[in-house]
Amino acid sequence: MKILQRFAALAAALTVTFASQAALAGTAAPIKARNVVLVHGAYADGSSWSEVIPLLQRAGLHVTSVQNPLTSFADDVEATRRVLALQDGPTVLVGHSYAGMVISETGNDPNVTALVYVAARAPDAGEDYVALAARFPKPPASNGLVHSGGFAQLNEEAFVHDFAGDLEPARARALYAVQGRISDALFASKTTQAAWRSKPAWYAISNNDRTTSPELERFLAKRMNATTVSIDSSHVSLISHPREIANLILAAAGLDEQR
């Protein structure tokens, strides 16, 4: 009987220990990173991070912006993996918009210590994201898609007013001129991994987003238990609110905010 009581006491002690460890893991400080890899979304290119990059470099971080070909999900994943393979040490992986799918797929790289989603898709492994998005209000920008030759882009009105609505019109039109044309099949792709299930995540919600439903963004951020900020921004908060986005990335990197 005494032996059984001792085993019961030991089991109870182990339960408390494991529970305490789990609680500590949930509140652990971010691992300090020295690299940041930025991944752009659809209708954009790597230069869309140009306002954020200097702020991160000023904090001493090594920054690389991926150039997605946007020809297929597999091609974009491979482009990001090539960049991740060049990183030396702890790395924060950041995705804007569609690139949330890319970082979810590639974020289990051993060097990746944190994920940052900026108004981004964040599907679960194998999830039909199109069906998920259909449960939320349809964003106006989707009405401006123009298809040709197996690729698509936003027309100028949708780009200026719905994609980049809080930028000066001249700036928005310049970005429209260099937008990346996407494969028609891109958005129907499915991830095989959901790195946010095993890596700490941060999420920037764009409250005035007309390209991705803000309600969908809030759902995704809550589902992944992300550290979340809400910004009164269009879909391109990385351009119109670079300081807020940079500070979110710095937090994920275990560094202090900049003013």
Regions found by a protein language model. Give the residues of each.
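Active-site catalytic motif of lipid deacylating hydrolases and related acyltransferases
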Residues: 29-88, 139
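Active-site nucleophile elbow and catalytic-triad environment of alpha/beta-hydrolase enzymes
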Residues: 174-195
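Short beta-strand/loop motif that positions the catalytic acidic residue
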Residues: 203-205
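Bacterial N-terminal signal peptides
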Residues: 9-19
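Gly/Ala-rich beta-loop-alpha elbow adjacent to hydrolase catalytic centers
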Residues: 94-99, 103
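Flexible "cap/lid" loop of the alpha/beta hydrolase fold
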Residues: 108-156, 183-187
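Post-His helix in hydrolase/transferase enzymes
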Residues: 239-255
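Conserved loop-alpha-helix segment in the C-terminal half of the alpha/beta-hydrolase fold
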Residues: 207-232, 244, 252
